Amino acid sequence: ILLVTPVWNDSARLAGFGAALATALADSPLSIHWIIADDGSAAHDHAPLRDLRDAFGEIFPRVHLHMAERHHGKGAVVREAWTLRPDAAWLAFVDADGSVTPAEMLRLIHAAVDSEMSVLGIRKRTASTEFIESPWRGIFHRGFLLAAHVILDLQCEDPQCGAKILRGSHYRRIAGGLLENGLAFDSELLCALKRDGSTWSEIPVNWIEKPGGKVRPLRDAWGMFKALLRIRKRRR
């Protein structure tokens, strides 16, 4: 199992989440390899990332730091990190902000392994899960869901949740056609898996928005809308 945590100028938030994740991974019976994938952060963030990698390694030795040469986007660095273990049976990623806790991510990984099916975390209020987001992010979230459904016919309750685990063999069949480097890469990924005949299960997770996130609804909405149109055009 290869688990990737993408970061970009985010060593401060990684510090708390990463320590908790390292502890959770060390306690897990699963064979997991963890890669912190830096998406071309500024030079002043390189040393803190290396220090964090070393500190996490004291807790969980199977952690590595991958440094992309330049910033291309979350999708690009996750895909790049996934190529580092081309034989991995499972490929996963979890965002570094801690909105999805390490315990929740491990729950998803166990669910995937037990069911032998790809698993997507989804942000959804249920009797057992909590979902807290700001009003502006909520509007952006619901608007993107509607756009993805209308433009791509994407049948997924929450394509953007930052916690996914995929069967490695299924991903590798479609990896060569994935081009979106930014925040729409999840939608392109799921569309490609669907066209290839792959299936997945969707599991609600506890998700609590954390301060300091990179998503800016007003700034990012137009770019993500254009990305959905690009994905649809390439599918034709």
Tell where the protein language model's regions lie, with residue ranges:
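Donor nucleotide-sugar binding loop of glycosyltransferases
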Residues: 10-13, 41, 74
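A conserved acidic beta->alpha catalytic loop
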Residues: 38-49, 98
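Acceptor/aglycone-binding surface of glycosyltransferases and processive sugar-polymer synthases
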Residues: 68-85, 90, 102-183, 210-215, ...
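Short, well-formed alpha-helical segments that are part of the catalytic scaffolds
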Residues: 10-25
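Hydrophobic targeting segments
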Residues: 1-5, 21, 32-37, 225
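Hydrophobic helical membrane-anchoring modules
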Residues: 1, 153, 177-236
